[in-house]
Amino acid sequence: MDLEEKLEEFIEKMEDEEKSKATIKKYKANINSFIEYTKGKELNKKTVKEFKNKLDTVDEFLANTTNGYLIILNKFFKFIDRKDLCVKIIKQQKRFSLEYSLSKSDYHRLLRMAKKRGQEDNYLILRILGETGIRISELEFFKVEAIDKTMSIRNKGKEREISVKLDLLRLLRKYCRNHKIKSGLIIFNPDTKKSYAHSTIYRRLKKLAGMARVNKEHVHPHAFRHYFARCYLETYPSDIAGLADILGHSSIETARIYTKLTNNEKELKL
């Protein structure tokens, strides 16, 4: 079976279903990673499990990130009539612990290092992620025309509003002036004029963590959402519903995990 050919057919189906460009891009990248891994190997359940274990042990992958890969792969396997290859997803709480959380001191060390190195774009990315709780993929909604105290974020077919603090608002406007950005994306690859690949941002922040002597395991795809959530709950400890709304969680129970993290931190201080 030619998996690359099947992938093209699968992507065509996703386009017919009017999936967003970001979703299709993610599907293609994730399935391509699996195809690369399987080269020279037999396509069977054992190989899929080995790939799953590989994802589960890489520093930058937490359970929810690994599950994103597995859900996409399972969908692809069903498309090619290989349901026998489908694997179980990982329980979210398995690795969602304080061990992988970004502390306030870590966050501010990253900011100081980005500023010290003159990395204006990394500094701005850190400020946006840490102060709004958006996903890295949602940076594309930060456009010159949209800069305001309240901004709309659309993801997974849902729209939500986020608040932008005045000092961050000023920083965004100053950045645009200094870099002569008059319209469109604020954070973008200067070579392609398009959004940075998510993996590029992860790598850059990991590298920055090394420079700042911050544990790289604490700088993962959702580290800054976790950080924002815990800071929010320190200020509004009983407003889990409000936090769920800001983060775009459909269930309050999903946001409740951050309460557990905050309680764990309190226990460590005793």
Language-model features: where?
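Conserved catalytic core of the tyrosine transesterase superfamily
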Residues: M1-L270
